[in-house]
Amino acid sequence: GTAPKRMIKEWLENRSDKHLFEDSVGNDPSLMDVIKMVHPKPTNKNREAFYAYLLGKTYDATLLPLNVQEFEAFKKTPKGTRTVPNVPFQMLTALDLSTKEWTEIARNAKWHMTRMNLNTFERHGVFNENGMVDLIATRLRSEKDIKNAKVFPYQLFVAYMTATSAPVKVRNALQDAMEIATQNTPKITGKVFVGVDYSGSMTAPVTGNRGTATTTVNCNQVASLMAACIMRNSDD
């Protein structure tokens, strides 16, 4: 309908170039799909060049937003001699990056991104770089960051179970973070009784059997974790 399209056009017009570029990460639909669907009218030459860039058309590179220019220059510069641009992590992972560049990404990563990419950092040698193990461990167990991230214990439990090759300091930090994250779970008032099902079916993975997409965490582990969180936050 015309009303939804008009709303999307207004959203595109009011979105800054920086944020719009960050929004271009992802598919189904992609930002390119959205632009093709609503046909927004550029308000200036810079936005016209930016839309052309996002649509894969010919554009004037000098009119592109600064972060887009930096990203394109980064891709054309030999690895090891360039500065990592301030763009979403997902835009960089498909590129051929040096250990130095991966280390820079890890050093500047937000809390959630750090938690979700421990194996990636390990695989690219980040933990072998001076000071990075302590930096990552300190970030992971930061009480302030854990509360701001509103992370739940099960997310940290999954990270712990999958980061089997991470340094001991990092894995210990995940355990500390898990304990702190219990504060992010709801508190139930009154007398609380917890009964955990330990029948044979509870040994199944949480995701079910999905081939390579099967989680390493099973149902009884999640049930036990939920029970522990309730006990931590309940007085009786």
Where are these regions (language model features)?
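Long lumenal/extracellular ectodomains of secretory and single-pass membrane proteins
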Residues: G1-N218, R232-D236
